[in-house]
């Protein structure tokens, strides 16, 4: 992308009405959610695209830095930092990453040009405890919607390791 696309802060997300944003980001690369003539991005998506230099985010007339967007995200979600690391890692690998809140997970992940997602991603810190019941519930939901459940574990060095959790029938 050559020219940076302007987005505007609106609560816990950003939006643009520019056709270029809709074509380049939504239609061609799977970013955001289209509602009417507005493309909405989550703060994680916005931070990622600002860091890449593809968009700029304005709050009133002031341009927000990557760090400011990150702080906004962290204020709204204490795990924003690790979710961002996982989001960035998956996007950098070429996957389309969307919210999976309605599935009880953090992200749903699509292969490029796929109509349906293959994976549900749950993000955890390495030091975090997860009960067997929590894990079972997440796997059941994933299985019920024909997705693979993946735990993305972020360690103290901010490295991400992915574990596929499966339901096995004997």
From Swiss-Prot:
- Gene name for this UniProt entry: endA
Which residues form each disulfide bond in the chain? Answer: none
**What reaction does this catalyse?**
pretRNA = a 3'-half-tRNA molecule with a 5'-OH end + a 5'-half-tRNA molecule with a 2',3'-cyclic phosphate end + an intron with a 2',3'-cyclic phosphate and a 5'-hydroxyl terminus
Origin superkingdom: Archaea
Lineage of the source organism? Archaea, Methanobacteriati, Methanobacteriota, Thermococci, Thermococcales
> Which EC number applies?
4.6.1.16
Keyword Cell wall biogenesis/degradation listed: no
Tell me the protein's name: tRNA-splicing endonuclease
The record describes the protein's role as: Endonuclease that removes tRNA introns. Cleaves pre-tRNA at the 5'- and 3'-splice sites to release the intron. The products are an intron and two tRNA half-molecules bearing 2',3' cyclic phosphate and 5'-OH termini. Recognizes a pseudosymmetric substrate in which 2 bulged loops of 3 bases are separated by a stem of 4 bp.
Matching entries from Gene3D superfamilies are given as: 3.40.1350.10, tRNA intron endonuclease, N-terminal domain
Keyword Lyase, does the record have it?
yes
UniProt entry keywords in alphabetical sequence: Lyase, tRNA processing
GO CC annotation: what is one?
Answer: cytoplasm
| Family membership noted in the UniProt record | Belongs to the tRNA-intron endonuclease family. Archaeal short subfamily.
GO biological process, alphabetically ordered: tRNA splicing, via endonucleolytic cleavage and ligation
**Organism, scientific name:** Pyrococcus abyssi (strain GE5 / Orsay)
- Active site, per annotation: 110, 116, 147
> One MF term in GO for this entry?
nucleic acid binding
Query: PANTHER family this protein is in?
Result: TRNA-SPLICING ENDONUCLEASE SUBUNIT SEN2
What is the protein's quaternary organization? Homotetramer; although the tetramer contains four active sites, only two participate in the cleavage. Therefore, it should be considered as a dimer of dimers.
């Amino acid at each position: 992308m050559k020219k940076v696309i302007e987005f505007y802060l609106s609560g816990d997300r950003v939006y643009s009405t520019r056709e270029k944003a809709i074509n380049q980001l939504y239609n061609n690369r799977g970013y955001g959610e289209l509602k009417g003539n507005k493309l909405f991005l989550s703060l994680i998506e916005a931070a990622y695209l600002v860091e890449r230099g593809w968009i700029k985010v304005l709050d009133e007339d002031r341009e927000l830095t990557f760090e400011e967007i990150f702080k906004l995200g962290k204020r709204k979600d204490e795990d924003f930092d690790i979710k961002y690391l996982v989001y960035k890692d998956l996007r950098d690998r070429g996957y389309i990453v969307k919210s999976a809140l309605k599935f009880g997970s953090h992200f749903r992940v699509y292969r490029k040009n796929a109509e349906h997602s293959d994976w549900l991603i749950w993000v955890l810190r390495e030091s975090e405890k997860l009960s067997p019941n929590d894990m079972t519930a997440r796997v059941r939901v994933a299985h019920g919607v024909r997705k693979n459940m993946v735990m993305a574990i972020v360690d103290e060095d901010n490295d991400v390791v992915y574990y596929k959790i499966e339901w096995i029938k004997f």
